[in-house]
């Protein structure tokens, strides 16, 4: 489908880039600008990013932005329940690609907690995340081909609780269809309260997924649907 065929809700922005490199640089510049505004207004800022392979170039570009990183807190939208030393750790990814150079001065608050069970780890993380200076100032989300975002997976056990717009938890246990299955995620109530919300996607398959998500009425079928409303801006390249 053509990007022009996308029928976005009122208040949802769209930025189209020509390549992955352009998207990474442009997204980093927008995030940096929003963080500067937050710092100017309130003296500190909270940035929440997503993991996976797609954000690497963006994280590296953002690490080079001239910011007062010492006044910025960085956290994750979700995490695989693995130690930071594990290859699948989102925290490890952020430390390698974002928290370097001047950006290493940022305060990082991760989700992973060692525990006897995923549920216990989520409870520990929930307590730990009370250090986050909510609400989130800038949130950068991704999206899977199944319409998940963060670790809010369609039909996953615990999804109803995680999608509760009035929920009070800051971290919940979730199960993913792909390995590693055990995940920790910020719930909808925390994510949707972010002041600036950005969704970074790439390619025709993600465009088709986005179009399908816009058409569903039951957000549990494609959880990203819950975020496809103002103040979201979508960053896409073909």
Swiss-Prot record:
It comes from Pseudomonas aeruginosa (strain ATCC 15692 / DSM 22644 / CIP 104116 / JCM 14847 / LMG 12228 / 1C / PRS 101 / PAO1). Pathway: Carbohydrate degradation; pentose phosphate pathway; D-ribulose 5-phosphate from D-glucose 6-phosphate (oxidative stage): step 2/3. NCBIfam families: pgl. Pfam families: Glucosamine_iso (PF01182). Hydrolysis of 6-phosphogluconolactone to 6-phosphogluconate. It catalyses: 6-phospho-D-glucono-1,5-lactone + H2O = 6-phospho-D-gluconate + H(+). This is 6-phosphogluconolactonase. The gene is pgl. It comes from the Bacteria.
């Amino acid at each position: 489908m053509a990007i022009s065929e996308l029928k976005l809700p009122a208040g949802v922005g769209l930025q189209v880039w020509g390549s992955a490199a352009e998207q990474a640089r442009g997204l980093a510049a927008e995030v940096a600008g929003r963080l500067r505004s937050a710092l100017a207004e309130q003296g500190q800022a909270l940035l929440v990013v997503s993991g996976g392979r797609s954000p690497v170039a963006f994280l590296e570009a953002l690490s080079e932005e001239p910011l007062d990183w010492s006044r910025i807190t960085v956290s994750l939208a979700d995490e695989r329940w693995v130690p930071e030393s594990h290859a699948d750790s989102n925290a490890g990814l952020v430390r390698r690609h974002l928290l370097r150079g001047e950006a290493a001065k940022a305060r990082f608050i991760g989700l992973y907690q060692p525990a006897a069970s995923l549920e216990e780890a989520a409870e520990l993380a929930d307590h730990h995340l009370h250090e986050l200076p909510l609400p989130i100032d800038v949130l950068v989300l991704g999206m899977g081909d199944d319409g998940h975002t963060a670790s809010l997976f369609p039909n996953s056990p615990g999804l109803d609780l995680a999608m509760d717009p009035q929920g009070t938890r800051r971290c919940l246990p979730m199960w993913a269809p792909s390995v590693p299955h055990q995940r920790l995620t910020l719930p909808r109530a925390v994510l949707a309260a972010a002041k600036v919300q950005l969704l970074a996607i790439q390619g025709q398959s993600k465009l088709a997924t986005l179009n399908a998500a816009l058409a569903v009425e039951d957000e549990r079928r494609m959880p990203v649907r819950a975020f496809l409303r103002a103040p979201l801006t979508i960053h896409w390249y073909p």
